[in-house]
Regions:
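AAA+ P-loop NTPase catalytic core and its hallmark functional loops
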Residues: 6-173
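Long, compositionally biased low-complexity segments enriched in polar/charged residues
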Residues: 1-2
């Protein structure tokens, strides 16, 4: 077996992103909504509930900018989801596979927090402890159990920063 050197074409293709994070892919729309949104925002929200709804369902802004719809469906469901997030309650999107639950949650997180990457992928092997934090084992061995040895999970980071955390496949946990 001999390794062939990478060509410029191969290196270029390896650097391509398959799918950008939502807040990157739709950055222009989110920025236009931010600029034209003078409505009241809940604490730590980047957009008002009205703007989050427009971002998901699409529409034309006062300045003529067209926001593309991300969700084609019942408007009332989106309004209820956004209103729920504006309270101190959690939002559970429940349904059969292929009904855009992950898609909607990713866009909600991007519009509300400006960050859709606070994600925990549920598996049968994840414990309640792992939902909150992990351990830096090198630090744990060197210094023993301490705050420095803890590695915060996406859920813990979201709570510290006041952002939306998403848990995918909750029923597997």
């Amino acid at each position: 077996f001999s390794a062939r050197p990478l060509t410029a074409e191969t290196e270029k293709n390896m650097s391509l992103v398959i799918r950008q994070h939502t807040e990157t892919q739709f950055a222009q729309e989110l920025e236009e909504l931010r600029k034209s949104d003078a409505r009241q925002r809940p604490p730590n929200w980047t957009l008002s509930p009205w703007a989050v709804t427009v971002y998901l369902l699409g529409g034309q802004l006062d300045n003529g900018f067209e926001v593309t719809p991300k969700y084609i469906g019942n408007r009332r469901l989106v309004e209820i989801a956004v209103a729920t997030l504006a309270t101190d309650r959690a939002l559970l999107l429940y349904g059969v596979p292929g009904t855009a639950k992950s898609w909607v949650s990713e866009h909600l997180a991007a519009a509300v927090s400006g960050d859709s990457t606070m994600l925990i992928q549920g598996t049968a092997g994840i414990s309640e402890e792992q939902l909150r934090y992990g351990w830096n084992y090198a630090m744990l061995l060197a210094k023993g159990p301490s705050h420095d040895a803890l590695t915060p999970s996406p859920l813990m980071r979201a709570m510290e920063l006041g952002k939306v955390a998403r848990v995918e496949e909750l029923t597997r946990i």
